[in-house]
Amino acid sequence: MNKKKKKSENTIAENRRARFNFELTNKFEAGLSLEGWEVRSIRLGKAQITEAYVLLKDKEAWLIGCHINPLANSNKENDPTRSRKLLLNKKELAEIFKSTQQKGQTCVPTKLFWKNNLVKCEIALATGKQG
């Protein structure tokens, strides 16, 4: 029978489709610039990164397409798919920029997880699988 794998306690969301569609090479751990309502929603497990990707522009990395459902009792209009800045150091950004300039290379988010009460995003350099 099909048994669901248990997520570890610190894993919030996982992008299994990235492992299926891409061959992942180098992995990086990036912080996320979030608003308060987003952190509260993530604590309730309302985050999805299956359609997300990483956009590199102006020497910055952005997480695009990550869907975080707003809380039901929120009193203002919140955008669940807004662009969120990834926090990386200069050496990591330079390595990612250099690698993605090569033909066929891209950068995809693989999972969201907690680390010392902070939300982190694991991103990986990837090459599309042939076939």
Language-model region placement:
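Intrinsically disordered, Lys/Arg-rich N-terminal extensions and targeting peptides
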Residues: M1-E35
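Arg/Lys-rich, often Gly-containing low-complexity segments of ribosomal proteins
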Residues: S8, A13-A18, A47, N73-N89, ...
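Flexible glycine-/small-residue-rich
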Residues: G36, L56-D58, G65, I123-T127
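Short acidic, Gly/Pro-enriched loop/turn segments at secondary-structure junctions
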Residues: G45-E51
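A structural signal for short hydrophobic beta-strand segments in well-ordered beta-sheet cores
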Residues: A52-L56, L112
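Helix-adjacent hinge/juxtasegments
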Residues: L55-I96
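Beta-rich strand-turn-strand
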Residues: L87-Q130
